[in-house]
C-alpha cells in the first residue's frame, strides 16, 4: 500500500467511548494495586500491542484487549482535548 499526499479520514465507532473510559479506569486501578506504574504500563501496551504489559489481575488484560489500540488512543486524545477546553 502506497502513501499519498491526500488527507485520509479516520473514523471510529463512537458507541464504545464510555466503555473504553471505564475499562481504562479499571485497568489503571488493577495495575496500581499490583504495584506497577499504571501510566507506563498502559503506554507500553498501547504502543506495542503486547498484552504482557497488563496483568491478568482482576481480568485487566482481557478487559483492555476487548478494544483495538486505535480506539483506546482515540478516547485518550478526546479526553485530553476536552480537559483542555476544546469543544468537541
Swiss-Prot record:
A Pfam entry, by short name: IreB
Family statement: Belongs to the UPF0297 family.
Name listed for the protein in its UniProt record: UPF0297 protein SSA_2241
Organism field: Streptococcus sanguinis (strain SK36)
Amino acid at each position: 500500500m502506497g502513501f499519498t499526499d491526500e488527507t485520509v479520514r479516520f473514523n471510529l465507532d463512537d458507541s464504545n467511548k464510555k466503555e473504553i473510559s471505564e475499562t481504562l479506569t479499571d485497568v489503571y486501578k488493577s495495575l496500581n494495586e499490583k504495584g506497577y506504574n499504571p501510566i507506563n504500563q498502559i503506554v507500553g501496551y498501547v504502543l506495542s500491542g503486547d498484552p504482557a504489559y497488563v496483568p491478568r489481575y482482576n481480568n485487566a488484560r482481557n478487559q483492555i484487549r476487548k478494544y483495538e489500540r486505535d480506539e483506546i488512543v482515540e478516547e485518550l486524545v478526546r479526553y485530553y482535548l476536552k480537559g483542555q477546553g476544546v469543544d468537541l
